[in-house]
Amino acid sequence: MQLLMRVPSLPELGELDCNICFRPYNLGARAPRRLPGTARARCGHTLCTACLRELAARGDGSRTAARVVRLRRAVTCPFCRAPSPLPRGGVTEIALDPVLWSRLEEKARAEREGDPMGSPAKDSGEDGEDDDGEAESEKGAGPPSAGWRALRRILDRVLAPARRLRRPLPSNVLYCPEVKDIAHMTRCTL
């Protein structure tokens, strides 16, 4: 019975990943941004900054939609189709989702307290990857030495640019909770 009480009633409440690319939000390039919508059509859906940039750059895929996006500077929500105006500063000026942002800050703070050296790549929020496989292998190994931690930080710095380069989103991105569950189970990125 306790297990049932821990599970949120809505799956969206416990999610810390983008519903477009299925990658986890972070404090850097994948910060959670909440689409405001317009006075007529309120939106409120949350996307990561990278997906929002991609949507702003390509529009809906049709030439007329791309032209309208350039003229009016608006992004159409992929879930509810509500238009959201882009501020003059671009995608990074859209307000952050305060609930998700605070949860990400708490998560980062907990990770920093767990690692006394404070890994710079993790603190900057640039590394949005899951290192579950590495974490599982390190759990039984005991605390890593300072030399291994320094080597890990150097590797994170060297590999950070390559991790940021990702394939672009396909033009026909569909949202389906079942597809998302399958993606999480197979640990693949759609």
From Swiss-Prot:
Protease is among the record's keywords: no
Ranges annotated as RING-type zinc finger: 18-81
Biased composition (Acidic residues): 126-135
Keywords tagged on the record: Metal-binding, Zinc, Zinc-finger
Keyword Metal-binding in annotation: yes
Classification via Pfam families: DUF4632 (PF15451), zf-RING_5 (PF14634)
UniProt superkingdom: Eukaryota
InterPro entries, sorted: DUF4632 (IPR027952), RING_finger_E3_ubiq-ligases (IPR051435), Znf_RING (IPR001841), Znf_RING/FYVE/PHD (IPR013083), Znf_RING_CS (IPR017907)
Molecular functions per Gene Ontology: zinc ion binding
PROSITE patterns the UniProt entry points to: ZF_RING_1, ZF_RING_2
Region (Disordered): 108-147
Protein name: RING finger protein 227
Gene source species: Mus musculus
Designated gene of the protein: Rnf227
